[in-house]
Amino acid sequence: MANITMKELLEAGVHFGHQTKRWNPKMKEYIFGERNGIYIIDLQKTLKMFKEASKFVSDVAAEGKLVLFVGTKRQAQDAIAEEAKRCGMFYINQRWLGGLLTNWVTVQKSVKRLKELDEMATDGRYELLPKKEVIKLERERKHLQANLAGIKNLNRLPDCLFVIDSNKEQIAVKEARKLGIPVVAVVDTNCDPSEVDYVIPGNDDALRAIRLFASKIADSVAEGSQLADKSMIESTNVSNAAEVIPQSYIGDDEEHGLAQPTEEAAPVEEEINMEEVLGKGVRKQPVSENENVEAAAAEQK
């Protein structure tokens, strides 16, 4: 599993939630307190729950299964695409097409059309067509490319979703839940954690926070995939797997975007005083006069 530290979380601003007026009462257990009208996320819980999520995605990849990275908000688009490619998985970073999972057969027809247009653009067939027709086909190709490029080689439903902002990607989350596909998600203070299988409480808006989580999850996937490859080789060529000594890892050349396995996250041996870390001005829960009323109303629904 990929390791993550309290220092990394703090430097990335993972502890900053939304304004106190924009919150979901179901996130109460993950909130440490409030400062200047902003909820502060309990990073002790973020560390613990990230470790669980990291282990899960690593195990999924180790079984040769597929992870789909999802993040269509502007600040998440680049990180989602880069990290998914780096660990050899798939992504959606522009727009989630309704029915992408639940209407998989139809989506695959669109993917097939994209591949056909890509071939036409490279094999010389465009040169045989009228200019207006080429412009029309190119417009169609670019539209499909924008929405489906990250799943062009995904030949079956994914086995797990990694999501940035479960509110923004609620359609993807609902489709996954309907099909029984586990969801790992970065969940901010305005989200509903009950819709997610593996909750990672944290800031889902800050670019540094998004990049941190996406890169660490990609590391875990890469490590799991490496174990899957190693297991396949051992079962095929070695009679006694216990005698096999690992010789190499997936590349460590960051310049070329290759994933590097990391050590398993060590358990937190001592409690970190959040008040000391965050300084003065943090009020613990409840932080608003209407909070208990809101929470009670939410529980009755």
Curated annotation (Swiss-Prot):
Protein origin, superkingdom: Bacteria
One MF annotation (Gene Ontology) recorded for this entry: structural constituent of ribosome
Keyword terms, alphabetized: Ribonucleoprotein, Ribosomal protein
SUPFAM superfamilies in the cross-refs: Ribosomal protein S2
InterPro entries reported in the protein's UniProt record: Ribosomal_uS2, Ribosomal_uS2_bac/mit/plastid, Ribosomal_uS2_CS, Ribosomal_uS2_flav_dom_sf
Residue numbers spanned by region Disordered: 282-301
Biased amino acid composition, Low complexity: 289-301
Pfam families: Ribosomal_S2
GO CC terms of this entry: cytosolic small ribosomal subunit
Family, as annotated: Belongs to the universal ribosomal protein uS2 family.
Alphabetized HAMAP family for the sequence: Ribosomal_uS2_B
Protein name stated in the entry: Small ribosomal subunit protein uS2
Organism of derivation: Koribacter versatilis (strain Ellin345)
